[in-house]
Amino acid sequence: MTNLYDETVEILEIHDKTIADIEYIGSSETKINTNKALELMKKTNYHSGYGGQEIADNLMIKGNGFIMTRGEYDGSEWWNYMQTDPSLPQVERDVKSFKTNRGWDSLEGINDLEGGE
């Protein structure tokens, strides 16, 4: 069993964040009081492995410099963490294609730009 609160804290810690960095919990249509949401998360245990999805698929957490959304594949669930203010390159590079013919390749890999700036 996975505890939703513990899972959330673990993901935050991996990214050097804490519960104190959370600014919003809910969905794009529903805001939940943060303290009440955290208390409910502490009481929420679920099977994160394969099977049926148990946690709301539109649950999200927005915080200082990040957003977390629920990921799911075939019933397996997790938090997706995305930095909202990433340090991005300032130098433009020539790109010839967005499409890969090898599958699961990066923009840099498709355009032979690995390791450069």
Mark where each language-model region is.
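Acidic interaction surfaces
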Residues: 1-117
